[in-house]
Amino acid sequence: MFITLKDNDELVSVKKTTGNDEILMASSNGRMVRFNESTVRIMGRSASGVRGINLDGGILVGMEIVEPNEYVLVITENGYGKKTPVDEYRITNRGGKGVKTVNITEKNGSIVSFKTVDDSKDLMIITDSGIIIRLAVDKISTMSRVTQGVKLINLKEDSIVSSTSIVDREEVSDDNINGETIEKESEELSFFFTSSYIISLSVH
């Protein structure tokens, strides 16, 4: 066992870090924190970790390592999305609620995914009804933190976005990019993220 989970908790993400990276964590209710990993002390392998974000009734939708000149790409359950320069997210206190990353309304719904990206990548959006759509990241609107985004995928009635993935542009043939729909049914690790907690382990 490499982490102790609390009741009703689950492991969400694992990332390799340098020891001085900046971390982004986002909740489904539209908030995001950015903090330096140096604020998380090194712990034993089976520790539960310390709080990374106050979810305030939401759930953790992911975490990313901050890279210069990248965008934060946010996708909501009703198929809306946007990208925002990472510099718009100021450093906040680890364990706090963070800053608003999207204006959540009945129209766009809760956040289901966020990624840090650059314009050389493609975005795959997957719905709970088995639809996949691929979009070039450079075609997605760049907007401020507090906007609701624009519609990226038309959903069937009662369908929602279930997950997303960032892929290299050459991984899939040109027949499946820019909005075409497809229908179908040992490195060293140092950071572990559960529903709202974070643990740092020495990799040596």
Question: Which sequence ranges carry the predicted segments?
Answer:
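C-terminal interaction appendages of subunits in large macromolecular complexes
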Residues: 1-191, 201-204
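Generic detector of N-terminal low-structure segments
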Residues: 193-195
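Short, low-complexity segments with poor structural confidence in diverse proteins
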Residues: 197-199
